[in-house]
């Protein structure tokens, strides 16, 4: 796998995990159920598509500034993904930077979605984001047993909320992203 492919996979994985953490956080903190979580997800996907179009039109930095402008008082301090483990090598620091940038964008889009789909104001959005960080830290602890283990426990949380089986696809997994392998 090339470095560019690794970076892209890393960003995608971070985005997927933080979006799942956001949904779990909405359920944990406010009891938001399956139907309304579906509305939030649909609204977030629309925001993410808009962000992607803006990124292509004006570049990443301007698109991020526009997203921050839309968020305004909903999320004035943005979102900084906590490190699940201390980076040691330059590659680890770069990976953390990519994860943080992806998570910042995804959380921003989900925050806008919660505002639009659930009429959440700044207090509720910020409460959800704080709970999202807590859920992500919990996920980070789970990945100490390996990425698959962390994903499986996060999937269990989503199964509890959606009352439907969720499987973790590891068929294309070549190297860990959030934790260590068991071998």
PLM segments and residue spans:
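Intrinsic disorder/low-complexity detector
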Residues: 1-26, 50-116, 145-183
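Long, low-complexity interaction regions most often at the N-terminus
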Residues: 15, 30, 36-40, 55
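A structural feature that tracks compact, well-ordered secondary-structure segments
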Residues: 27, 115-116, 125-131
């Amino acid at each position: 796998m090339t470095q560019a492919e690794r970076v892209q996979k890393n960003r995608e994985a971070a985005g997927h995990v933080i979006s799942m953490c956001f949904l779990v956080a909405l359920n944990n903190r406010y009891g938001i159920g399956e139907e309304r979580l579906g509305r939030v997800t649909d609204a977030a996907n629309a925001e993410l598509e808009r962000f992607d179009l803006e990124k292509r039109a004006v570049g990443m930095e301007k698109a991020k500034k526009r997203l921050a402008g839309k968020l305004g008082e909903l999320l004035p301090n943005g979102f900084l993904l906590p490190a699940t483990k201390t980076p040691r090598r330059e590659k680890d620091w770069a990976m953390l930077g990519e994860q943080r940038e992806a998570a910042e964008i995804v959380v921003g889009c989900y925050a806008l979605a919660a505002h639009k789909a659930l009429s959440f104001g700044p207090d509720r959005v910020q409460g959800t984001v704080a709970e999202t960080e807590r859920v992500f830290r919990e996920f980070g602890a789970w990945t100490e047993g390996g990425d698959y283990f962390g994903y499986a426990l996060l999937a269990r949380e989503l199964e509890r909320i959606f009352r439907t089986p969720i499987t973790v696809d590891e068929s294309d997994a070549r190297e860990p992203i959030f934790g260590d392998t068991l071998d």
